[in-house]
Design a protein with these regions (language model features):
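A generic structural motif
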Residues: 31-33, 58, 75-77
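Short beta-strand micro-motifs enriched in acidic
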Residues: 31, 67-69
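A short, polar/proline- and glycine-enriched secondary-structure boundary/capping micro-motif
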Residues: 9, 49-54, 75-79, 85-88
Length: 146
């Protein structure tokens, strides 16, 4: 489901009012091969959120969530925890035993937003070297737009 809330905008270069041909908001449900469901949302109109980029994965026994605004931490909930200890725990993911982190600073020091692009470039170059596809692929990205 998509929606364009603002149907016309002034072109920044020409000053002419033009029809808007892109979506201001999108949401879709998906059904994964393993039987689980997914909900994806994006919008330009989430006031109060500056570049909000989050994911949350919930399962029968555990859940994880991550937020770009706090990209060095992953939150984890384990339903098997003892009742009096149940709750979300925060995992600092910049120690050297986490993927990619052995290539950066001493364990525990934070990385920034730009470091994630270095990781993407490394994955891309590794895929060229090995011949194995990295993910997401251009086709996967295109398929989300159909």
């Amino acid at each position: 489901m998509t929606e364009t809330f603002v149907k016309q905008r002034m072109h920044q270069l020409t000053g002419k009012v033009e029809d808007v041909k892109i979506d201001d908001a999108c949401s879709f449900l998906c059904h994964f091969n393993n039987g689980s469901l997914g909900l994806f949302e994006s919008t330009r109109y989430a006031r109060g959120h500056k570049a909000l980029y989050t994911f949350e994965i919930n399962g029968a026994n555990a859940s994880i969530r991550w937020d770009l605004h706090d990209l060095n931490r992953l939150e984890f909930y384990d339903n098997a925890d003892e009742s009096k200890l149940k709750g979300w725990r925060t995992i600092h993911i910049t120690d050297g035993d986490h993927p990619y982190m052995d290539k950066w600073w001493v364990p525990g020091l934070s990385i920034g937003y730009e470091h994630s692009f270095v990781h993407q470039a490394a994955d891309f170059l590794r895929s060229i070297e090995t011949g194995e596809s990295c993910s997401p692929t251009f086709k996967e990205a295109l398929d989300t737009q159909k």
